[in-house]
Amino acid sequence: YNEPFHVARKMASLDHMSGGRAAWNVVTSSFKAEAYNFGREAHYDHEDRYERAHEFVEVVKGLWDSWDDDAFIRNKESGIYLDPSKKHQLNHEGKHLRVRGPLNVPRPPQGYPVIIQAGASDTGRELAAATAEVVFTSPQNIEAGVAFYNDVKGRMEKYGRARDQLKILPGLSATVAETDEEAEEKFEYLQSLIHPEVGREI
């Protein structure tokens, strides 16, 4: 829950402040309670969330393209601050979003801050293949990890993207102890604290 203009502005500002080291983790929100804080009576359904997210990313990138890299001249002697011919009006009108632009921040140093995504569902994988540069994943075994890798990479061509434009970063959940036996006992104890009904409700 956010507006593309706000995200584009915040990420562009962070990219400027960090010298081109900003990244944006695109999250579609999972909990219906979040909707109540943003003027909605119900959460978007799964398909709509990812469809909106795809459009959202394209709008944010369009806002980052509001200005050419050299649009801001800032010449005190001439009194010229910017070259208006290097401004690009977005004028986006889509199914979920309507954004005029331009962004009121210069183009980020990276052009586009790094876009990250972590969806594991079919629609999440499509979003990753279409828009992301980095994908977080947490497969339960090597075979599942290889299958996820090949599946997401295999979807990229239809979006006009090369496979090497996306990095997939597997997660690791470690249980640390002095011995294997102690680690397994600790893991089983932690698993016992999970209440199935609470998990389903969340």
Residue map of PLM features:
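Hydrophobic or amphipathic alpha-helical targeting/insertion segments
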Residues: 1-37, 44-47, 52-56
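Conserved, mostly hydrophobic/aromatic
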Residues: 14, 24, 60, 115, ...
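Active-site mouth loops of central-metabolism enzymes
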Residues: 1-5, 41-43, 47, 109-122, ...
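Acidic (Asp/Glu)-rich catalytic clusters
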Residues: 15-21, 129, 157-163
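Short, acidic/polar
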Residues: 7, 117-130, 189
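Hydrophobic faces of well-ordered beta-strands that scaffold small-molecule active sites
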Residues: 20-26, 113-118, 133-137, 166-173
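An alpha-helical appendage that flanks or caps ligand/catalytic pockets
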Residues: 47-110, 143-202
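Active-site-proximal loop/turn and secondary-structure-junction residues that shape catalytic pockets
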Residues: 1, 28-32, 64, 121, ...
